[in-house]
Amino acid sequence: MTMRYTNTAPVLFALAMIGLMPAARAAEAPQPGISSEASAAIRQMSKTLSANEFSFQARTIRVYQDDDGQPLHVFHTVKVVAHRPDQLAVHRTGDDGATDLFYDGKTVTIFGVNENKYARVDAPNNIEAMLDDVSERLNVDFPLADFLNVDPGKMFLSGVTSGRELDPVTIDGKPAQHLFFSQAGGIDLEVWLDKTEQATPQRLIVTYRLLPGQPSFIAVFSDWNFSTHPSDAEFVFQPPAGAKQVELQAPQKKESK
């Protein structure tokens, strides 16, 4: 999981969803420093999340340090519908408003619901490249993007230097695996997978240990559905009355005090 931290609270498209990078084939053998149990669990998760169609929800929290050194928390609920290779819809609501993303294989539209403004740009012809493109345009990270990659396991382990399985836990009455990974650059990843053949993600925590205040990203997943059959219309944005089209721009950086 290749990641960089950005305070995305003021960004129009600060979707708490979604590391990013090109598709690659899953490793056949455990990487050095990653236990066989942890590697096997991620491979099983990857097999499940490689489905052509699926949807899920996630409740997320971004924890970051403000200019005065105080830890602040931003909560979101994210709903994701994916149809590989080239359709994606994301609906995010939270403390800083609501934002929708629609990708139909040709264009990507980002709609600020509260502002009734949207930006639409031409996009690459697959989900991974589209997310990478938007990430570069806005200079933000999308911590759930690896789960949307065509090879989620490979991308999740990208940059990881060590990994192991911790003690088993129970989540909502169901057994789960608790895995811990360290990534170069002082980033720690914890992921909880449903202890079934599907091994769907149940929780994710990303901690940036070397940054001031050790900011983190937390996600709790639910409602995984691999039997969904979304229509093409779900991925096409229809501007509501009075909506204004704007340019897609990166957020302005605050000047240091």
Segments from the language model and where they lie:
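Gly/Pro-enriched, hydrophobic low-complexity segments
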Residues: 33-38, 43, 59, 109-110, ...
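Surface-exposed, charged, gly/pro-rich loop-and-adjacent secondary-structure segments at domain edges
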Residues: 134-164, 235-239, 252
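Sec/Tat signal peptide C-region and signal peptidase I cleavage site
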Residues: 22-26
